[in-house]
Design a protein with these regions (language model features):
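Helix N-cap at the start of a conserved alpha-helix in ABC-type nucleotide-binding domains
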Residues: 17-19
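H-loop/switch region of ABC-family ATPase nucleotide-binding domains
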Residues: 42-43
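A short, surface-exposed alpha-helical micro-motif characterized by mixed small hydrophobic
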Residues: 48-50
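Catalytic Walker B motif of ABC-type/P-loop ATPase nucleotide-binding domains
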Residues: 6-9
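ABC ATPase "signature
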Residues: 66-67
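ABC ATPase nucleotide-binding domains
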Residues: 80-127
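A short, proline-enriched helix->beta-strand linker immediately N-terminal to the Walker B motif
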Residues: 1-4
Length: 127
């Protein structure tokens, strides 16, 4: 059987971090090799931010947001109003932006936050 669309409901729920990582790596390989669409239902926003290339946010039974992870997670205040969790790194970088750190947008991964902060530090002039 070679389905065009694979629908998974909380595929990593209850798994240890290593096994969860292996599951998501396997799903990425399946998506790339077979060119499948994978619909992932999850409440774990870090997984969604890392795995998805498109995110739909459901709120009160309707699609409230639709976009790339970067687009969706940059709408921090709206997500918080809907009581939707965001990745911890997104929350941290959003807080930095509110404090005046000139990040382009909230980051969705630690690696992305590192790159953004390194770029800012590179642009800083020595005292």
């Amino acid at each position: 059987m070679q389905p065009e669309i694979l629908v998974l409901d909380e595929p990593a729920a209850g798994l240890d971090p290593e096994t969860k990582h292996e599951i998501f790596e396997l799903l990425c390989r399946i998506r790339e090799k077979r060119n499948n669409a994978i619909v992932l239902v999850s409440h774990h926003m870090e997984d969604v931010a890392q795995f998805a290339n498109r995110v739909w946010v459901m709120y009160k039974g309707k699609i409230a947001m639709d976009g790339t992870p970067e687009e969706v997670y940059s709408r921090v205040e709206e997500l918080e109003e809907m009581n939707i969790g965001i990745p911890q790194i997104t929350h941290l970088t959003y807080s930095l932006i509110k404090e005046g750190v000139p990040l382009p947008r909230p980051a969705i991964s630690v690696k992305e936050a590192e790159k953004m902060l390194a770029e800012i530090l590179k642009e800083e002039k020595p005292l």
